[in-house]
Amino acid sequence: MEKRDKEEMSRRKFLKIVGVSAAASAAALYGCASEGKPASSEASVLGEVPVDKMTYRVSPKGERVSLLGYGCMRWPLKPAPDSDGNVIDQDAVNELVDYAIAHGVNYFDTSPVYCQGFSERATGAALKRYPREKLLIATKMSNFQNYTRENSIKMYHQSMKELQTDYLDYYLLHSVGGGEGIKTFHDRYIDNGVLDFLLKEREEGRIRNLGWSFHGSVEVFDYLLSLDVKWDFVQIQMNYVDWRHASGRNVNAEYLYGELAKRGIPAVIMEPLLGGRLSKLNDHLVARLKQRRPENSVASWAFRFAGTYPNVLCVLSGMTYM
């Protein structure tokens, strides 16, 4: 085995250098990007990306997954031709997808609620131009309000229609852990029979991998892991601030990742840049990082932190501009 670069810092030392002070950086930007506002892009701070340098992880089912995944919640917008509002710029979306695929990205993550409900359609139109077997498409059961069985199943089928596919590679119970905790989880997925339906869809092959994304109560996280259900993956918020200093309703990523790793459940990572804040550190922290690796962007440190953990399958980035 080759020796590691002597200049490479351990994660522990890196955490000591950046510390929790990184959390005080600029505010995050969410939702689809407004026209002419590229600041919401996480990719724009990474610099030039080599075409042949993508890292891939192999899932327990043998899928070759790009370590960088495309989060499709911030598609660029343009003025609507017949109204005062904005619509997704499909030509721009196509260009972004082309660039991502050319650089090795094959995992695309969306939801029925992203971009005011239009992300799946735009994502599906862009991806339809490529061989389906070359792509890994992830979307979600985002039944936050009307979670009857009928409405939830309708949402599931509508997702496949919008994405122009007859199967989903990765399907998630969206944002588990909020509301009234375990009660809300039961209302959304158990008492209405929706989880049983999705398990049957996985058995039939229309869902290749079934998992959930987590925000909120650690009791709900532990509860889902205790169920007699084989989860293929779980999506968690993980970055070097949230690792041990999660704020608000979030749980320390060190705990979340550790619980998944010891069960052999792959982790998909969201918010590696904490909504963009970890690309905008204060001058003191930037200087310390540049002293170690002057050629690397500030954001690249955050991506490397998330991507170096062996049980991480994919690190998502919401990219509006490249």
Model-derived segments and their meaning:
Residues 93, 119, 152, 156, ...:
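Aromatic/hydrophobic pocket-lining residues that form the small-molecule binding cavity
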